[in-house]
């Protein structure tokens, strides 16, 4: 982080695995209690987040895809764990939810999250969600309070590069539920399974699609 901070004046962002997701993927042979395990991970993540902020991170994101696998447990523990992980952190606080890498889960995905609206009660500033591949029902975004939403508008299950107009259409759909200052267009998830050419092309389409919508919004003022 210090290396990066020393070489750019732009905002920096770094991601960390979320405490809930880590807890649900490990075998507990010590605590014998799910809540204690989750909160222990949250405490460890908090120490890392504080160090990253001190080193210059502007945005810190927790990846919490596993809240979808046990929504009942997520309702009991996830918000408190996320807030504990960010306790004392002044940087922009974000969390990412998805249904799995598109390359790994290329087929039909749910069109709704079993755990999402609950994050309105968290201390998060931003919520990142996969929406393009699963064709998410975006009405749920209205329930996220004043959070900024990083809306997935790039389908990463295919290397095919979207047109700028396709991306613009997905952004417009998000704007039907959110004010422009609360929507950040983004890829659905990580792009590590794409070729460099495909990833670059998709990111360019993202920029071009956002520019189209930005121009439309400016024309209405």
Report the location of each language-model feature.
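Domain-level signal for soluble alpha/beta catalytic cores
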Residues: 1-221
């Amino acid at each position: 982080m210090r290396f990066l901070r020393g070489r750019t004046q732009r905002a920096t962002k770094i991601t960390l695995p979320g405490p809930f997701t880590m807890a649900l993927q490990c075998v507990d042979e010590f605590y014998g209690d799910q809540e204690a395990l989750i909160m222990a991970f949250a405490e460890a993540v908090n120490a890392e987040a504080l160090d990253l902020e001190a080193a210059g991170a502007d945005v810190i994101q927790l990846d919490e895809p596993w809240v979808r696998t046990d929504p009942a447990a997520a309702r009991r523990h996830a918000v408190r764990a996320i807030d504990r992980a960010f306790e004392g952190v002044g940087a922009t606080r974000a969390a990412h939810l998805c249904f799995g890498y598109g390359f790994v889960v290329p087929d039909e995905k749910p069109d709704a999250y079993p755990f999402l609206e609950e994050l309105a009660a968290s201390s998060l500033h931003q919520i990142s969600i996969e929406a393009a591949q699963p064709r998410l029902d975006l009405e749920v975004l209205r329930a996220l309070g004043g959070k900024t939403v990083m809306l997935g508008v790039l389908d990463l299950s295919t290397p095919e590069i979207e047109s700028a107009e396709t991306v613009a259409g997905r952004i417009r759909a998000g704007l039907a539920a959110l004010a422009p200052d609360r929507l950040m267009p983004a890829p659905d998830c990580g792009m590590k399974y794409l070729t460099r050419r495909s990833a670059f092309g998709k990111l360019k389409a993202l920029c071009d699609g956002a520019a189209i919508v930005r121009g439309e919004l400016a024309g209405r003022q």
